[in-house]
Amino acid sequence: MKKGIHPEYVKCQVKCTCGHEFEILSTKESLRVEVCDKCHPFYTGQERNIDRGGKVDKFKKKYGLA
């Protein structure tokens, strides 16, 4: 590697919305993430139902057709 052209790696503090914090090496000093291995359904085995509906469902609900 050429010297002086690569960014420095520093310890990066990663914070998840669930409250879990951990450190990695990165070019940034801090990161915020929405999901991590402590709260993601694949790793926890718990299922979360996030059904927001499509455009047709929103239209039907808006005009009372549902």
From Swiss-Prot:
A GO biological-process term: translation
Positions with a binding annotation for Zn(2+): C16, C18, C36, C39
Pfam family, one: Ribosomal_L31
Gene Ontology cellular-component terms listed: ribonucleoprotein complex; ribosome
GO molecular function (one): structural constituent of ribosome
Domain of life: Bacteria
Note describing how the cofactor binds: Binds 1 zinc ion per subunit.
Intrachain S-S bonds: none
Keyword Kinase (UniProt): no
Cofactor: Zn(2+)
Keywords: Metal-binding, Ribonucleoprotein, Ribosomal protein, RNA-binding, rRNA-binding, Zinc
Record's function text: Binds the 23S rRNA.
UniProt subunit comment: Part of the 50S ribosomal subunit.
Similarity comment: Belongs to the bacterial ribosomal protein bL31 family. Type A subfamily.
UniProt protein name: Large ribosomal subunit protein bL31
Gene source species: Nautilia profundicola (strain ATCC BAA-1463 / DSM 18972 / AmH)
